[in-house]
Amino acid sequence: MNKDNKWTMINALFITVISVLLAFHLKQHYDQITNENHANKDKINIKNKNVRIYQNLTYNRVFPNSKLDIITPVDMSSNAKLPVIFWMHGGGYIAGDKQYKNPLLAKIAEQGYIVVNVNYALAPQYKYPTPLIQMNQATQFIKENKMNLPIDFNQVIIGGDSAGAQLASQFTAIQTNDRLREAMKFDQSFKPSQIKGAILFGGFYNMQTVRETEFPRIQLFMKSYTGEEDWEKSFKNISQMSTVKQSTKNYPPTFLSVGDSDPFESQNIEFSKKLQELNVPVDTLFYDGTHHLHHQYQFHLNKPESIDNIKKVLLFLSRNTSSSGIQTEEKPQIENPSNELPLNPLN
């Protein structure tokens, strides 16, 4: 065997070993996420006497995880229509569950909003743009049942956290950017005039710079969702995901919240500047570096900053919708009265 062939074989063996180790490493990550998702099935009780929650309504059967929760105020006048908030949870596209967002979302719903909290299929089994397709399906399901809920579809809010904020921001762009919607071959769920705001917690909005944030496991998240190792160059639809590129003057007023120790802080600053350039009203809740607020601090509801975040969200909503955001009095708690809501769930 000559020297060239010997080194060729050694290189091939080295590449094979590295590939096996990488595959094993990724499998460990996927197994960990799977175990986390199984653990997530334990029901989270909402200890909020001012709301009703209708859980795990099936909105479609095409993809797995096609379930949603609806949170409403206890008191809903049949003559008064309420703004609706559609929410997408985070988890890096590969994990997470809607139920963990319900305690915070209930604090918003009790002020006079109907919240629709949407689950979706997870990567790597279900890649881009599956969650966005499912969001379309979820909004359609709610619209088809509009006679059974006092929803004002001229007062729509789109929201999400972490990867869910990226999804929610892109879903909002799909509604307000004709070119993006046509390129993605999506139907329009809402006209720009119907969307009164976007609420985004700790999201990321520029796929060309998100790797630079060094967010933990960002490589795993993006590869799982796009199917590409080098997503910035190899994934043909990467620009569709960058809301900093897809937002237009039709983008709705936006509330951006991020911790000062969150690696995605720079992404939120960049997005806020882009919206300002477009003359889109934007509320920001950013901190000065002394609060040490990590990713998803908003959901640690006992933190003073989390309490402040909810107050700022309600102020934003009161300025952009008909609900006042005034604190409610406690009412007797009603848990999961799903038989009282005459929807047409598929389950």
Where do the PLM segments sit?
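Alpha/beta-hydrolase superfamily serine-hydrolase fold, recognizing
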Residues: 4-347
